[in-house]
């Protein structure tokens, strides 16, 4: 039962789409287990650049079946627009399904997101304002609407649920935020229309995946966001609303941990994050700006500039251990090409005391002083290199040192956005 999990080892935006796309060339099924349209995965092919949000990265292979799992919060209009846009540019797509157990981002969820961020002002989380957090809040509070609730034949129960839910939302809109209420009839009609449009895609996804595994099919689970945004183990409260870890990937995809034999952690050769929250290695100088511009570090979904910093091996090792990574992919190595020296954060200090892992309390994490190891840069173009052995010795040393620090073999190295710009290495070859 070959299941591979691809997940982010940092704060998201590590290049998981590129790695999933590469692995999906020989996979039967790709499942998206978590997140929502707030995530963005980029795939570059000979046909151009494809920016995916909720649809798995394997969709560009006609042989690949793609599934949006139960752990995803689905915005029906965003999903329908995304699939239509893909069909216009790439007519030969893989098959696409959506779990009937996935929760729905309803029209009131983005409004709640927006109004709450406004209310918080400078203390805001920095969300993408897509309604992701409010949708997952309703899920955990057991008052969410699921895909199954929208389908034809469920109109009576759907209206009853909305009649129960909407007064609470409107109370918040009117009395907390000073905004206009939503109309029940309009909301019901919108949801019913969504259900009709979604119906051809809806399946019992967990049953489909388990049947495929029983038949010997290969499955990739493509997690969204990154481990350091996990609501339990990340920089809470500056986190996402669903688990981007290996455990969360299993839960959202309907796969048992014992069915997983490969966990690929994806890391950038430097570090980025979007929005507020602790970021010990952040660069606010010209070096940071150079990396941001070279790496086009602007959000796939929001277009917001990403914060940029040196590689944080403390957070990366924490992530590798937490997820039980069997191997790692290191992306965007070529973005560091011009630098005369590169730094790796090898330790944390707080009040002159060494800290071996990210602190749980966000205030303590914000007080971390990074301990750096300085390595020489390579100052030459690596984007045309086709094997690891052809990289400059300084670049090889940088990769090997990261591998040593995180304790996981680096088997893939990205030196550009295209499919061909991956250097493949057997596990353990760098040590």
From Swiss-Prot:
One of its GO terms (biological process) is 'de novo' AMP biosynthetic process. Plays an important role in the de novo pathway of purine nucleotide biosynthesis. Catalyzes the first committed step in the biosynthesis of AMP from IMP. Homodimer. It is an enzyme of class 6 (ligase). GO terms for cellular component: cytoplasm. GTP binds at residues 12-18, 40-42, 306, 332-334, 414-416. Pathway: Purine metabolism; AMP biosynthesis via de novo pathway; AMP from IMP: step 1/2. Its EC number is 6.3.4.4. It is found in: Cytoplasm. Binds 1 Mg(2+) ion per subunit. Mg(2+) binds at residues 13, 40. Belongs to the adenylosuccinate synthetase family. It catalyses: IMP + L-aspartate + GTP = N(6)-(1,2-dicarboxyethyl)-AMP + GDP + phosphate + 2 H(+). Keywords: Cytoplasm, GTP-binding, Ligase, Magnesium, Metal-binding, Nucleotide-binding, Purine biosynthesis. Substrate binds at residues 300-306. Its cofactor is Mg(2+). IMP binds at residues 13-16, 38-41, 128, 142, 225, 240, 304. GO terms for molecular function: adenylosuccinate synthase activity; GTP binding; magnesium ion binding. SMART domains: Adenylsucc_synt. Pfam families: Adenylsucc_synt (PF00709). Its main location: cytoplasm. The keyword Protease does not apply. This is Adenylosuccinate synthetase. The active site is at 13 (proton acceptor), 41 (proton donor).
């Amino acid at each position: 039962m070959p299941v591979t999990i691809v997940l982010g080892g940092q704060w998201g935006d590590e290049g998981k789409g590129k790695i999933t796309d590469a692995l999906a060339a020989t996979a039967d099924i790709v499942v998206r287990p978590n997140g929502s349209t707030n995530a963005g995965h980029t795939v570059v092919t000979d046909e151009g650049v494809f920016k995916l949000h909720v649809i798995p990265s394997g969709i560009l292979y006609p042989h690949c079946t793609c599934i949006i799992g139960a752990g995803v919060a689905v915005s029906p209009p965003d999903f329908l627009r995304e699939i239509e846009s893909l069909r216009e540019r790439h007519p030969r797509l893989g098959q696409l399904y959506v779990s009937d157990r996935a929760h729905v981002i309803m029209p009131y969820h983005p409004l709640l997101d927006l109004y709450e961020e406004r209310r918080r002002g400078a203390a805001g989380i920095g969300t993408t304002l897509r309604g992701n957090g409010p949708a997952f809040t309703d899920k955990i509070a057991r008052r969410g609407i699921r895909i199954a609730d929208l389908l034809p034949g469920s109109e009576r129960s759907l209206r009853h649920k909305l009649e129960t839910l909407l007064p609470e939302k409107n109370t918040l809109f009117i009395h907390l935020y000073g905004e206009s209420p939503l109309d029940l009839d309009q909301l019901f009609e919108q949801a019913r229309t969504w259900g009709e449009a979604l119906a051809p895609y809806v399946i019992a996804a967990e049953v489909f995946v388990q049947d495929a595994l029983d038949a010997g099919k290969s499955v990739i689970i493509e997690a969204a966001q990154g481990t350091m945004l996990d609501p339990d183990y990340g920089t809470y409260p500056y986190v996402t609303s669903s688990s981007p870890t290996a455990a969360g990937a299993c839960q959202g995809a309907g796969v048992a941990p014992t069915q997983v034999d490969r966990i690929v952690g994806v890391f950038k050769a430097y570090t980025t994050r979007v929005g507020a929250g602790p970021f010990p290695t952040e660069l606010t100088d010209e070096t940071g700006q150079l990396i941001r511009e070279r790496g086009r570090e602007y959000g796939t979904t929001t277009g917001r500039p990403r914060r940029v910093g040196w590689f944080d091996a403390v957070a990366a090792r924490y992530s590798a251990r937490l997820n039980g990574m069997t191997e790692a992919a290191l992306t965007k190595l070529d973005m560091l090409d011009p630098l005369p020296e590169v730094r790796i954060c090898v330790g944390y200090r707080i009040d002159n005391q060494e800290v071996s892992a990210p602190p749980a309390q966000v205030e303590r994490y914000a007080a971390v002083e990074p301990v750096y190891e300085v390595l020489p840069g390579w100052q030459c173009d690596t984007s045309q290199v086709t094997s690891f052995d052809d990289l400059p010795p300084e670049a090889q040393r940088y990769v090997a040192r990261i591998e040593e620090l995180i304790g996981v073999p680096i088997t893939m190295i990205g030196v550009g956005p295209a499919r061909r710009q991956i250097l493949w290495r057997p596990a353990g070859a760098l040590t």
